Regions:
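Periplasmic polypeptide-binding modules associated with outer-membrane biogenesis and secretion
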Residues: 1-160, 171-173, 187-196, 201-203, ...
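Hydrophobic core residues within well-ordered beta-strands of beta-rich domains
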Residues: 170, 200, 276, 317-319, ...
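Solvent-exposed, non-transmembrane alpha-helical starts
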Residues: 12, 76-78, 163-165, 229, ...
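C-terminal outer-membrane beta-barrel translocator/porin domains of Gram-negative envelope proteins
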Residues: 159-164, 277-387, 395-399, 403
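Short glycine-rich, acidic/polar surface loops and turns
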Residues: 380-382, 413-421
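A short, conserved beta-to-alpha structural element at the edge of catalytic cores
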Residues: 16, 418-437
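Gram-negative/organellar outer-membrane beta-barrel architecture
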Residues: 106-299, 327-329, 355-360, 369-373, ...
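Extended hydrophobic-aromatic, low-complexity segments
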Residues: 152-154, 349-350, 389-395, 404-408, ...
Length: 458
């Protein structure tokens, strides 16, 4: 068949077809050609374009036809209407509308809008976005409902110490997301063994402040090591949001440390430091996966500043990286890979300024925050197998290396173990059995550590 397009036709002006006045093709390919041309038109923003063959005639041993194309008007996104959640955060709403305002509308744009709403941990989409075409406007309708991303995990215990005084031990991990309908994120963490260590962390993140792509977050971290020292760290950061799950921060961080015992000749001493910091964060959620909702996390923070102590004043630099990713082999088999790294550069080091690690959120098989280093790097792996919709089992293979210049100690670490997760009506129960070893300490059953947690969502 010979299809006459014409000279300077609309299809040629739009770059959808080559600049030829006639196309020649087998008759059997005509339908595929018409569909492909309409798809090209749709990608260019002509969603309601019409295409047909007219004036069909037979000429000797071939057919002739004219190609008729009606492109209506270029379609652009004029508005995004959110249904199902009247108190959807205004800052998020304004930002996503700004991002797509007057963007050429096609199915790829609709897919991106759907994907951007999937990044919001505080909503679920009840169905795929729909489009309303009028004579002059193009509106996208998004259907959402408020989700339950809040999380609670903890226990508390009471007892007496050797002097008969009351001691409190326990654990609390509380995450509140969008409780005030502004997309905020508040995290509170407290852990005390009633004797040696107490940790308290609190953080608050406010995204899209003043309905702009800017956000702010603040942190307070307090760590007390028995009757030896206490560190109090504060941080404030101003961030720019490229999108909801990708942002950069510029901030200020300071720490004040108190030597409680004041022992002569100790590597522990009072100090204070301050840093100008830069931070990059990327998080990709998989909201339909209750077991593993965080698919990818990239968190890299670096800072340059100064530390003052009773004996010296040093310029310092640090970098801290936390990388995580779930690799889905299929629905039942998942490989989880984490990498935690930290480096502190200084002319000399004080014990109470070192990075502390070990435990369920770090290299497993070691007591919580029982290790310290100015340099630490690790690869933490799990092979996860989903046995049923409500239960999964996993292996634990953790590798680590650290350097502690206050004790001239370099060690390689190995953590081995297994665990399982059980989904109940009230939350997710996790049990982990792990054993840690170093070059000077072989794996022994007596050194094994059991980690138990129960995360309730509300």
């Amino acid at each position: 068949i010979h299809i006459y397009i014409g000279i300077n036709s609309e299809l040629q002006k739009l770059g959808i077809l080559e600049e030829k006045d006639t196309l020649i093709m087998p008759l059997s390919e005509t339908e595929a050609f018409m569909n492909a041309t309409l798809q090209k038109s749709e990608r260019e923003g002509y969603s309601l374009a019409k295409l047909q063959l007219t004036n069909l005639k037979r000429e000797k041993d071939f057919l002739k036809a004219d190609l008729f194309f009606e492109n209506e008007k270029l379609r652009e996104v004029n508005d995004i209407v959110i249904n199902g959640y009247d108190k959807f955060p205004e800052g998020h709403k304004k930002e996503i509308k700004r991002r797509y305002k007057n963007k050429v509308f096609n199915q790829e744009t609709l897919k991106k809008i759907h994907g951007d709403f999937e990044k919001f941990q505080f909503v679920n989409q009840t169905k795929y976005p729909e489009i309303l075409f009028t004579k002059d406007t193009t509106k996208v309708y998004v259907y959402v409902e408020k989700s339950k991303p809040n999380r609670f995990d903890g226990f508390i215990g009471f007892g007496n110490n050797d002097d008969g005084d009351l001691k409190i031990n326990g654990y609390l991990d509380l995450l509140l997301v969008n409780s005030l309908n502004v997309g905020e994120r508040f995290n509170l963490y407290w852990k005390s063994d009633g004797n040696k260590q107490t940790t308290f962390n609190a953080s608050l993140e406010l995204p899209y402040i003043f309905k702009s792509p800017l956000g702010i977050k603040g942190q307070l971290n307090i760590f007390k090591q028995d009757s030896t020292f206490q560190n109090t760290q504060t941080a404030i950061d101003l961030g720019y949001y490229f999108n909801f799950n990708t942002r950069v921060y510029l901030g200020y961080q300071s720490t004040e440390s108190n030597d409680i015992q004041n022992l002569v000749g100790s590597t522990i001493t009072d100090f204070d430091n301050s840093f100008i910091t830069g931070n990059f964060e990327f998080t990709q959620f998989k909201n339909d996966d209750y077991f593993f909702p965080e698919k990818t996390i990239i968190n890299i923070k670096a800072g340059t500043g100064k530390r003052n102590s009773e004996t010296s004043a040093n310029n310092q630099f640090f970098i801290n990286a936390d990388l995580r990713h779930n690799l889905y082999l299929n629905e039942k088999n998942i490989i989880n890979i984490k990498s935690q790294s930290y480096y502190l550069q200084s002319e000399d080091y004080i014990t109470n300024e070192l990075f502390r690690f070990g435990g369920i959120n770090s290299i497993r098989g070691f007591n919580e925050n029982s290790l310290q280093a100015n340099l630490f790097s690790s690869i933490l792996t799990e092979y996860r197998y989903v046995l049923a919709p409500t239960i999964y089992a996993h292996s634990i293979i953790d590798f680590g290396y650290f350097q502690d210049k206050t004790t001239d100690n370099n060690e390689k670490l190995l953590g081995l173990g297994f665990g399982f997760g059980l989904l109940t009506k009230n939350g997710l129960f996790n049990l982990i059995y792990a054993n840690g070893s170093t070059k000077d300490q072989e794996i022994k059953l007596s050194n094994s550590i059991v980690h138990i947690s129960f995360k309730a969502k509300f």
